[in-house]
């Protein structure tokens, strides 16, 4: 059985005045990973480095983004592989604090940052999942809470406008989805 993470997370680590922000994302495909990378590079334009690694299905990639070769991307990739995860992108954004860490220090810092991010992410078995979309009226929080608290639903994303739009991945035979289909409100579950 393959493991993946259930939700996107981030953690901050400071070492010798350098700030390392570790992000972990669930990614269905490489295109999704590239979109996250583009988003983070735009968000952290003043960062010294945006290093990453991913394992997505049979695809693996690691980038040191200007750090000495093998000191950033590979340690991140090793953390993903050690935990036997798939469909995961880890990005570590570094803001240089003025003190050089040396090659060994960089390996430890990037590895620790990746570990911190993954430690805060719950894991789940990766099954053949179906993507669902759900639009809720404000006030239907019980439905929202049942989704948030369900261990078999992952990659939960929210968008707030006149309704609460939710997309997520789940096994289409999941019991909580059957209860969503019979709610008497205007909740509509759509298979994407």
Task: Give the ranges of each region predicted by the language model.
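C-terminal regulatory domains involved in ligand/effector binding and gene-expression control
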Residues: 1-71, 157, 182-192
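Long, charge-dense
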Residues: 106, 110-129
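Terminal, non-globular segments
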Residues: 168-177
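Short glycine-/aliphatic-rich beta-strand segments at the starts of folded cytosolic domains
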Residues: 123-138, 166-167
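N-terminal positively charged helical leader segments and presequences
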Residues: 161-164
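Glycine- and acidic-rich phosphate- and metal-coordinating loops
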Residues: 54-55, 86-96
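Short Cys/His-based metal-binding microdomains
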Residues: 101
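Short amphipathic alpha-helix segments
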Residues: 134-153, 177
């Amino acid at each position: 059985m393959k493991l993946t993470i259930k939700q996107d997370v981030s953690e901050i680590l400071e070492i010798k005045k350098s700030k390392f922000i570790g992000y972990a994302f669930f990614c269905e495909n490489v295109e999704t990973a590239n979109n996250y990378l583009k988003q983070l590079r735009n968000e952290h334009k003043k960062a010294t480095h945006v290093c990453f690694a991913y394992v997505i299905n049979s695809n693996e990639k690691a980038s040191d983004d200007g750090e000495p070769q093998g000191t950033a991307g590979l340690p991140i990739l090793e953390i993903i592989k050690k935990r036997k995860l798939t469909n995961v992108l880890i990005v570590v954004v570094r803001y240089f604090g003025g003190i050089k860490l040396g090659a060994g220090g960089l390996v430890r810092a990037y590895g620790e940052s990746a570990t911190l991010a993954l430690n805060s992410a719950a894991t789940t078995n990766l099954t053949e999942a179906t993507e669902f979309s759900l639009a809720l009226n404000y006030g239907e929080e019980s439905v929202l809470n049942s989704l948030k608290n369900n261990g078999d639903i992952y990659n939960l994303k929210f968008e707030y406008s006149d309704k609460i739009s939710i997309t997520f991945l789940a096994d289409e035979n999941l019991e909580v989805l059957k209860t969503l289909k019979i709610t008497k409100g205007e909740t509509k579950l759509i298979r994407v």
